[in-house]
Amino acid sequence: MMNTPVSGLVPFPAPQEAALHPQAVQVRADQPADPRAMLGAFEQLLGEFALDGYAAGAGVESAEVAEPIALVVGTSGSTGTPKRTALTARALAASAAATENFFDSNSNAASQWLLALPAHYIAGAQVLARSVLAGTAPVIARSVTEPVHFSPEVFLQAVERMSSARRFISLVPTQLHKLLESADANPSLGAEIHEALGSFTGILLG
C-alpha cells in the first residue's frame, strides 16, 4: 500500500487536496517516477475495476456523484503556467475498456503491455493502469528505468520478455520513426524490428 504520492506533491493549486484519493498517484513532467511504485498504487486504486468485466465496459459508466481523484499528472510549466490533469479510477478504467474494445479479437489471452514511455507522462501512467486492470505484469523497457535512450535494441530486448500473445504498446511518433529509420538503414535489424512490431495486437501512437 502506498500512502504518499509517488513523486512528491505537485505544487499547483488545483485539484484541491480534499478531492485526492488517499492512494492518489501524483507525478509531474520534470520529475521521473518509479513505474513499479506506481503499479502498487494503481493496484489499490483500481481493484474494484480489475479483471472481470472491465474490457467489456462493465462498471465504468459515468458516476452521478463526484469521485476521488486517482491520478494527477502535472506539467513542468516550461511554456507557461503549470497545469494539472486529474483522472478518477473510473476514468482510467473507462479508457482501458475503450482500448480493449477497439482492438477486440477472438484471443483468450490476457492483454500485456510494454511500457516504453516515461511513467510520469500521462500515456505512460495509463499503460501501468491498463496493466493492473488486465491483471498482467507489464514489461518495462530499460529506457524507462535506466539511463539509456530508447533504441531498436532496447525495444527488441523488451519485446523478447513479453509472454502474452495479446500485446500492446504506446509510443510517441519519434520512437516509431526511430525504429522504422533503423529498419531501413539495416536490413538484418529491420527484419527483427518489423517482426516485433507485427507481433503487437495494437500500437497506440500519440
Q: For each of these PLM feature ranges, what is it?
A:
Residues L87, A123, L171:
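A conserved hydrophobic position in a structured secondary element of the catalytic/binding core
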Residues Y54-V73, N106-S111:
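Conserved pre-ATP/AMP-binding loop-to-beta segment of ANL
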Residues T75-S78, W113, L128, I169, ...:
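Conserved S/T- and glycine-rich ATP-binding loop of Class I adenylate-forming
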Residues P68-A97, D104:
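Conserved AMP-binding A3 loop
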Residues D104-T136:
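Conserved AMP-binding loop of ANL adenylate-forming enzymes
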Residues M2-F49, A93-L114, V148-A165:
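Conserved ATP-dependent adenylate/AMP-binding module captured primarily in the ANL superfamily
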Residues L117, R142-S143:
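Short beta->alpha connector loops at strand-helix junctions that form conserved
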Residues V144-G206:
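Adenylate-forming
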